[in-house]
């Protein structure tokens, strides 16, 4: 570039920074723009691996959707617990007015430090989310759920009134405002969403999510979570087998699957994942119903092996570290393993 053009560009860059603030424009090579994306662990080792970067990306929008009782809120509370372990601040915008603080505490959430809002309208919920993001002092904001973000006009109207497209317009406008602030403040914003059926569809997938198409475009990561079976102890159901598909991923290759157990009153079973992933990677030997590690039997049946790892956290952490190393998640191991060890 000749000298005159260089001077003109330097003057333009200086004017932009003066008018819009430092960092409003930059060269990709000058700054930490090209640095690795920071991630927040989901609390599920398998899902962290499937996401490719060791968790959910900071400074991005994430959508978690699935049928009722599939584990959507459990997964987001698990993310909040992981963020709090690292000293971060989390906010939960409970548009459904359904958050159970006792359950959240059982999943490891520090309820006394959790910011919670139960807004009356969709506009209020999204305005609160935007203000929290703009403050730059909140690390994770969860909105539960998009389906419950009812526009003010609908709340104030009559029961039978038609309000076509109001919610979709509300989401589209809010996401346009939110996106730039989220990136600038490096906040992780998670939207929980529900599934609806398209009526009269002859071909293709009849399932869709609520709130229009805007969230599908603005979300960097979309997770489809499903309950695939029940975990039983005798006749008693103690948890659910869960599968998560990474439907969209702008920060790593998409379409990967993760499977884990959600135990009632405990949340995601870390020990269960260590056993499954350990067997897959041949770190744990399985012969019949017996599980062994380094030639030593650790339990007959998955429940007993899980109990052994719970009682011996040093062995669980050792296998965890090997799984992370094999999956190139060594950095994530450094941030999560010590915290989990201290919890045992």
UniProtKB/Swiss-Prot annotation:
Subcellular localization(s) per the UniProt record: Cytoplasm
Predominant subcellular localization, coarse grouping: cytoplasm
Any one Gene Ontology cellular component term annotated for this protein: cytosol
One GO term (biological process): DNA recombination
Organism: Methylobacillus flagellatus
Chain positions recorded as ATP binding sites: 66-73
Identification of the protein by name: Protein RecA
Family indicated by similarity: Belongs to the RecA family.
Lineage, broadest ranks: Bacteria, Pseudomonadati, Pseudomonadota, Betaproteobacteria, Nitrosomonadales
């Amino acid at each position: 570039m000749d000298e005159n053009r260089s001077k003109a560009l330097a003057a333009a860059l200086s004017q932009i920074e003066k008018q819009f603030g430092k960092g409003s424009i930059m060269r990709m090579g000058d700054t930490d723009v090209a640095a690795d994306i920071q991630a927040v662990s989901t609390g599920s080792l398998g899902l962290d691996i499937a996401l490719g970067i060791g968790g959910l990306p900071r400074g991005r929008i994430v959508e978690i959707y699935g049928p009722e009782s599939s584990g959507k809120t459990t997964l987001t509370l698990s993310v909040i617990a992981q963020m709090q372990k690292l000293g971060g601040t989390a906010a939960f915008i409970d548009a459904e007015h359904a958050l159970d603080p006792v359950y959240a505490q059982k999943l490891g959430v520090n309820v006394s430090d959790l910011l919670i809002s139960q807004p009356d309208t969709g506009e209020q919920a999204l305005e609160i989310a935007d203000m929290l993001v703009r403050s730059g002092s909140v690390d994770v904001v969860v909105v539960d759920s998009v389906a419950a973000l009812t526009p003010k006009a609908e709340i104030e109207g009559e029961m039978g009134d038609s309000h076509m497209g109001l919610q979709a317009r509300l989401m589209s406008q809010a996401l346009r405002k939110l996106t730039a602030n989220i990136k600038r403040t490096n906040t992780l914003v998670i939207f929980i969403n529900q599934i609806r059926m398209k009526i009269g569809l002859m071909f293709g997938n009849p399932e869709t999510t609520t709130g229009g198409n805007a969230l599908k475009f603005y979300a960097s990561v979309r997770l489809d979570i499903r309950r695939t079976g029940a975990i039983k102890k005798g006749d008693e159901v103690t948890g659910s087998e869960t599968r998560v598909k990474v439907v969209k991923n702008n920060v790593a290759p998409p379409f990967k699957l993760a499977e884990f157990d959600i135990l009632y009153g405990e949340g995601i079973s870390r020990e269960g994942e260590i056993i499954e992933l350990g067997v897959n990677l041949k770190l744990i030997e399985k012969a019949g119903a017996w599980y062994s590690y380094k030639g030593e039997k650790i339990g007959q049946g998955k429940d007993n092996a899980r109990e052994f790892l719970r009682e011996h956290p040093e062995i669980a952490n050792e296998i965890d570290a090997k799984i992370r190393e094999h999956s190139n998640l060594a950095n994530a191991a450094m941030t999560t393993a010590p915290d989990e060890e201290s919890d045992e």
